[in-house]
Regions:
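Repeated loop/turn-to-beta-strand initiation elements of outer-membrane beta-barrel proteins
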Residues: 141-144, 240-241, 284
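Residues that define the transmembrane beta-barrel architecture of outer-membrane proteins
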Residues: 127-131, 224-229, 280-284
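Membrane-embedded beta-strand positions of outer-membrane beta-barrel proteins
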Residues: 146, 252-254, 288
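Flexible, surface-exposed loop regions and adjacent strand-edge segments
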Residues: 1-3, 7-17, 161-171, 267-275
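Transmembrane beta-strands of outer-membrane beta-barrel pores
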Residues: 1, 139-141, 150-154, 230, ...
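Extracytoplasmic gating/loop element in the C-terminal half of outer-membrane beta-barrel translocons
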Residues: 81-85, 95-98, 151-246, 250-251, ...
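Outer-membrane beta-barrel "beta-signal"
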Residues: 235, 280-292
Length: 292
């Protein structure tokens, strides 16, 4: 029997000095990682709420979502003290309401989540290194090979309408994980069986002014993956048999592509990114090889 194994690791190195080369299609900023994302950050408070007197700007919802009456009281106290959220100072279903996400006031201008609050995330959409490994074995007339590949050290912001967004629209469906686990609370009917104040995703919205769909770290996911890209198994007929067909080698094989993906990324496929496209298909093919 025989075997062969090869691997490769390609790391990318950040350039924190002058930019002297072109060719990258994303953002390039001196002193920042290549492809570092620039986005809103979700507000995260202590959850203590408003207890009277001067409002504590750090006492809001722990995960940034308005979930309870106490959260709403704190938001109203903030508005009464001159703060705004995405430019809004009104609590209403078609504006800022239960199940909405609050964004951080990164620049301290008392407007939480306006366009000036975007900041570098410290994460990049460009993998820090790519890994590949292939090996092949053969025993007598049987051969076997496989190819693995992976990418590590990057993040993807998956916030695509109708795939990972709580926006609803006529004629479009809602993806299952959001349909089954979105926030719902009607203060006029707290006993509504649909109530789900611990929902993982924001409330479903249609035509509201407040925006839960902006690019933020709420929808940022670690996109590391390791894939079994190909397996091939073959069998070569003994030469004493193949010679009867006037060929020196006759080999049959089965090849399987995109067999396994190991990842925590919840989107379609971390290899194709956040774009909406058909994911890489799992394929099985059969073939033959003839050498005269």
């Amino acid at each position: 029997w025989t075997y062969d194994a090869q691997g490769n690791k390609v790391s990318y190195v950040n350039n924190f000095s002058d930019v002297s080369e072109s060719g990258f299609g994303g953002y390039i900023c001196e002193g920042r990682q290549l492809g570092e994302t620039y986005m809103y950050k979700v507000y995260r408070g202590s959850g203590e709420g408003y207890t009277g007197g001067a409002v504590d700007i750090h006492a809001g919802p722990k995960d940034g979502m308005i979930r309870t009456k106490e959260d709403m009281v704190w938001v109203q106290a903030m508005i009464d003290s001159g703060y705004s959220f995405g430019g809004m100072k009104t609590l209403a279903k078609d504006q800022l309401w239960y199940g909405d996400i609050l964004y951080a006031d990164s620049n301290g201008d008392m407007n939480y989540g306006d366009t000036n609050d975007r900041d570098f995330s410290g994460h990049t959409s460009v993998p820090k290194f790519n890994l590949g490994f292939n090996c092949a074995f053969s025993y007598k007339n049987i051969d076997f090979s496989m190819l693995w590949s992976g990418a590590f050290g990057h993040y993807l912001n998956w916030n695509t309408d109708y795939y990972n967004s709580t926006l609803v629209s006529h004629g479009y469906g809602i993806i299952e994980h959001i349909a089954n686990n979105h926030y719902f609370y009607d203060p006029s009917n707290p006993d509504d069986p649909r109530t789900n104040q611990s929902g993982k995703y924001p409330r479903l919205t249609y035509g509201t002014t407040y925006n839960n769909r902006i690019q933020s770290d709420w929808n940022e996911y670690k996109a590391d993956y390791f894939k079994l890209k190909n397996i091939q198994i073959g069998y070569t007929l003994p030469q004493r048999i193949s010679s009867k067909f006037f060929v020196s080698k006759l080999r049959a094989f089965v090849s399987m592509d995109n067999i396994l993906t190991i990842t925590s990324y919840p989107g379609l496929d971390p290899e194709i990114g956040t774009a909406i496209g058909y994911p890489l298909m799992r394929q099985i093919s059969f073939g033959g090889q003839i050498t005269f």
